[in-house]
Amino acid sequence: MTEGLEIIEVTGRRLFDSEGLPAVEAEVELENGARGRAMVALCENSGNTDQMMEVLSECVLFEDASDQRGVDKILEETASSVGTAKCGGFLTAVSMAVSRAAAAGLGMPLYRYLGGTAPGRLPVPMMTMISGGRYGRNNSLDMESYMVVPVGAASFREGAARCMEVYQALKRLLTISGHQTGVGEDGGFVPDLR
């Protein structure tokens, strides 16, 4: 076991996400004081969330946070013994919180902890511009999402800025064309483009 990275506490909380929907948060504390936190939306049939949080919290106590595969295996085995569908996203929240705590415990950024020391590419942001399908409540589009990906951006920040420029330009075009600029569940515009 890596010194100081033993999981000494896992706390679960019920929250609401940015849309006011139920979510769960896991917070993991390590022996060396490092912490990690993650929030995941709950599915509709999440069962007894409090019970799932308690069961999954206890199953990883005293495990080595730097052994992500081992922790995930324990979580999956525990979840399958009680019914994975009823775990309501808390399994994912615990797994993510363990990763973040391990990275903090080792004093490195999460991307470096997960990606290793070899130079790699940082993630490229993707942004939904127009929502359709089940996300576009007020339109008849068959596609669920029309997204932009800022390929070639020099940094994540530059990529996000490019996405926002396109988003704002699209909003102006929709307004000029007389379309609504309300947004759907995933943040994309939901104009009726029939």
Residue ranges and their predicted role:
Residues 1-22:
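Short, Gly/Pro- and small/polar-rich lid/capping loops
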Residues 15-26, 83-103, 124-141, 185-189:
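Conserved phosphate/anionic-ligand binding catalytic regions in large, soluble enzymes, centered on
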Residues 31-33:
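Glycine-centered tight beta-turn/hairpin loop motif at sheet-sheet or coil-to-beta transitions
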Residues 38-108, 160:
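Metal- or metallocofactor-binding catalytic centers and their adjacent structured scaffolds
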Residues 65-72, 86, 110-113, 171-188:
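Flexible, glycine/charged-enriched surface loops at secondary-structure junctions
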Residues 190-194:
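Short glycine/threonine-rich loop-to-helix capping motif typified by GTGT followed
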